[in-house]
Amino acid sequence: MKKISEQKRKHLENLVDDQGIIGALAIDQRGALKRMMGKYKEVTAQEISDFKVLVSRCLTPETSAILLDPEYGLAAAENRAQTSGLLLAYEKTGYDASTPGRLPDSLDVWSVKRLKEAGADACKFLLYYDVDESEAINERKKAYIERIGSECLAEEIPFFLEIVSYDANNSDSASKEYAKVKPHKVIEAMKEFSKDRYNVDVLKVEVPVNMNFVEGFGTESLYSQDEAQAFFNMQSEATQLPFIFLSAGVSATMFQETLKFAKKAGSSFNGVLCGRATWADGVLPFVQQGAEAAVAWLETTGKTNVEELNQVLRESAVSVFEKIQ
C-alpha cells in the first residue's frame, strides 16, 4: 500500500471516476499526430491545437481526465469538461534515433511547478526502457526519473510514469521476435520503477503480451490463452503501485477485448489512458472536411468508443484507492 500526501490524494481524486477508476483520454501526441495529419496535407501548429480542442470539448464529458501536452494542448485543457481532471506531459516528443539509448528529455521551458501552475492535477513522463540495455544507459534513465519524482514530491502532485519497453537489438516492436521477449521487458521495467526511490504514484504501461500473437486473437499464435493470462498475473504481482494500460495505437475493439481478457486473467489494473483507439478515425474528417465534420464524428463514433470503453472499465478495473493510502 503506497502512502501519499493529502494534496497528492486530492489531485488524484480529480483524475478518477466515482469508482476510483482512471478512465482517461490521452491526446498528448505531438509527432505522431502531426504524422497522422500529414498523410493528407501539410498541417500547421494551429490545426494540431484546434483538433485537440475539439477532442477535449466533445469527449471529456465522458472521461475522468484528459492527458495533454503543454506545446499544443493548453487551449484543449481550457476547453475540457469541469468534471474531467488534467494530466500534462513533461517529456519532449519522440527520441533522437541517431543516439543509442532513446534517452529521456524534458520540455525546455517547463518544470513540474509550471505544469501545476498551468492547472495540471498530475505530471506524466514517458520513458523508453530496455531492462537489458547497458548499465551506462539505464543508470542515466534511473537518475532522470529520480529527479522528476523529487519534483513531483516537492510540488505535491501525482507522478504518472509511462513506460514503453523496447529491445535495443530489434527495432521492430510489432515483430514475432519482440513478442517473445515483451513480457520480460514490460514486467522487469515495472519492477524497477515501482521502487520507493522514484516516487512514482501511478504506472502507465503496456499490456504484457502482444495480443496479435495470443491464441484466438491474432492470425498467428505464439502464446496460448493460459500462458498469456499467466503474464497478466505476473504483471499485477510485479508492482504494489496502481497501474493503468495504454492503448498503443490498437483499434477500439481490440483494446476493449484486451481489457476483458486482462480481467479474466485476474489483472488488478486500475484504468486506462486511452489515446488513438478513441479518436484516431476523427483525424481524416478534420483534415479533409474541417471542424464541423470532425465534431460530427467525435459526437457519434468517438463518444460511442468512450462509452463502450467506460462500460468495460466498470466491469474490469479496480479502484486506485485499493493500492493507495
UniProtKB/Swiss-Prot annotation:
This is Tagatose 1,6-diphosphate aldolase 1. Belongs to the aldolase LacD family. Pfam families: DeoC. Pathway: Carbohydrate metabolism; D-tagatose 6-phosphate degradation; D-glyceraldehyde 3-phosphate and glycerone phosphate from D-tagatose 6-phosphate: step 2/2. It catalyses: D-tagatofuranose 1,6-bisphosphate = D-glyceraldehyde 3-phosphate + dihydroxyacetone phosphate. Its EC number is 4.1.2.40. It comes from the Bacteria. One of its GO terms (molecular function) is tagatose-bisphosphate aldolase activity. Keywords: Lactose metabolism, Lyase. HAMAP family: LacD. InterPro entries: Aldolase_TIM, DeoC/FbaB/LacD_aldolase, LacD_aldolase, Tag_1.6-dipho_adolase. GO terms for biological process: 6-sulfoquinovose(1-) catabolic process; D-tagatose 6-phosphate catabolic process; lactose catabolic process via tagatose-6-phosphate.
